[in-house]
Swiss-Prot record:
Chief localization: membrane
Organism: Shewanella woodyi (strain ATCC 51908 / MS32)
Entry note about domains: The HXXXXD motif is essential for acyltransferase activity and may constitute the binding site for the phosphate moiety of the glycerol-3-phosphate.
Listed name of the protein: Glycerol-3-phosphate acyltransferase
Gene of this entry: plsB
Location within or outside the cell: Cell inner membrane
NCBIfam families: plsB, PRK04974.1
This protein's record includes keyword Protein biosynthesis: no
Stated family: Belongs to the GPAT/DAPAT family.
One GO MF term attached to the UniProt entry: glycerol-3-phosphate O-acyltransferase activity
InterPro entries reported in the protein's UniProt record: GPAT/DHAPAT, GPAT/DHAPAT_C, GPAT/DHAPAT_LPLAT, GPAT_PlsB, Plipid/glycerol_acylTrfase
Gene Ontology annotations for the cellular component aspect, listed alphabetically: plasma membrane
Amino acid sequence: MSKQDSLWFKSLRWLQKKLVHTIVVPQEPFKDLNLDPEKPLVYVMKTESLSDIAALSEITGELGLPSPYEPLEVEGRSTPRVVCLEGAKPLMGKRESNEFFLSSFMDLLKAHKESPDLDIQLVPVSLYWGRTPGKEDDTMKAAVLERENPTWLRKCLMILFLGRHNFVQFSNSVSIRYMADEHGTDKRIAHKLARVARVHFSRQRKVMTGPVLPKRQALFHALINSESLKRAIQEEATSKKISEVEARAKAMEYLDEIAADYSDSLVRIAERFLTWLWNKLYKGINIKGAEQIRQLHHDGHEIIYVPCHRSHMDYLLLSYILYYQGMVPPHIAAGINLNFWPAGPMFRRGGAFFIRRSFRGNKLYTAVFREYLDQLFTKGYSVEYFTEGGRSRTGRLLAPKTGMIAMTLNSVLRGMERPVTLVPVYLGYDHVMEVATYHKELSGKKKKKESVWQVFGALRKLGNFGQGYVNFGKPITLHSFLNEQVPDWREEIASDPEQKPTWLTPVVNTLANQVMTNINDAAAVSSVTLTSLVLLASEQNALERTQLEKQLDLYLKLLKDLPYTSYTSVVEGDGKQLVTQGLELKKLQLDSDPLGDIVSIDESISIAMTYYRNNIIHLMIIPSLVASCLTQHERITRDEIKAIIADFYPLLEAELFMGVEDTDKLVEQILDLFIEQQLIREDTGFSVVETSINQLLLLAGTVSETLQRYAIIFNLLADFPEMERSDLEAESHKLAKRLGALHGITAPEFYDKNLYRTLSVKLKDLGYLKDNGNKADVERVRASANGLLRSSVRQTIVDSVAAERSA
């Protein structure tokens, strides 16, 4: 009888099963790690452990993986399914020699030497009983729950106290066939395999648990005694005419206000609460791209998460997802407005550090904050901050605030050698709890101060919020970014470390815009965002159900056949399923009559629904602009369409943070797809197939409000070429309000002054303003914009500008 079949062993497994709850990382190993189900598989574990193998055996069946107790049959010989690097640590005495375990690698290599067709996948498996990183000088806790090399007695204690927080992590497989063919099959290669595996397990543990945490007061004293803060304290004392003791005390107060106080115990409790909360709120959370971030952690990068900011839920969602994806929740830069009782202390112990909205002119606070941020980077803690500075009230990305990015870049310039990588993150929701509040704020209502009562009020309204979306975008490694932007930056900094480089501000601005572009590149298309995009382009926010389903199918084909980027995700299903989902979420309403079903957006939430539309409008804006060209011209050529897109794209890029590299190629692909779908026909030019005109008109409706804004701006520029930039912004905003009142435009962003400011800056960069404006270019773009508008809207704009001229 084998050991695992004995009554004693079965009893221990039964007891362990009652005590242990296992979380698997990644949740779908075959899919996420590209394991080949057709090839044999062997698990590699760091230490021989009956409890670890038992925990692994409980999950392998559900995942479609072979049991660790099931031997591998190779060429008629039985081989253990699990290979360990070292034996279990005994309660007393020395661990047994590793030679026995090394022989397992030798046997596998030998089998490949004898069988040229054999290709066994070595899959590293790491098990963690709890994820406490430990604290500096935390000797007592380390003695009781020493995690790296526990004896059987300590392992029993770990299972008893931390069994509900057991993580099993699978890693990318190694092909023994590749190793044998490339490096041979002798003992030297077996040693190399074992050595590489040990390094892998060591790095993996750091990814899962993070670096050790310093004692808070010890950290404060270390920071206060740093050279930069000593200088800042002396300068504060001199400038404010106070003693150095008082200045030092003020610096300590700032540190206490800013610094996080991370607690693994609170994180474990929060994990249980958040699991309940997400299950209560959402039907599921969709994640894309986590594996690349795990790899960056594994490779030793300092990771800084830069998500978009939709809701206060963002703080919780990203940390929760990272925890379940086998990464340490980051230290989060939170606005000081969230430091209210009791949430503030809880956020702080969950990893939040607090930042004032503005600290310009407060040199001591700036120095303290910068030194604290440097310390986080140096110690290897991942960090998260929101580059928008606040939550978007319109659903579009806000113009980035560059302060935190500048501080991060300065840390690199001061000599941080470890690669620092920004990870853009797109966060999306089928329902944002604050969206009704946002509309009130945009309408002029004063923003309420955050309090515990707001939290209770939100929790009282828990319901079916559909799905959540977390997409990790293309990472930006700062050393590589600097090498591209300023090839000789190292030499320049080394020659004069104290001098601020002249190129720093423009490089920071470029980096901030690249972050926002990469966030939008990772957008998630859902049933709510896509149905709102269609219905809000219709005249009464309503369509026949069959027409809506057909339009959604067209959009899905565009998004899947011409993917915006490889980081974008698109909802599964067809138009019919998306409409059903929207109805279930109560975002749409259904009215039936003898002629069929009509699906609409209720008037009371139509403005709120623009928020969800704006989340993904950038994905469909160019197809919409192409459709507008086709429907507003009886006949138009490919080159004419490309020219119009080329004129408008720089403005679209500026306001929507788009990153299309080749607009001409994209236009060609869109036109070819329209031909394939029998929406248009081509001879000497394009004409619309009469039976498909409604589909193209609906698609064109998405860009209509954007074109109206551009028409306002270029009509003003054409008639007032000497207009100052500030006047252009003010006049454009005034005419937009008039146009909205006359034509029923309710989208909040249409009246957003900041949007006109962004456009005016871009217009100056493009050479349209008076300093170097080209009248012929302005006239051409005005004609294009006017030509794509409905006649009534065009006339309102022309008449309004004429009235301004005669005023």
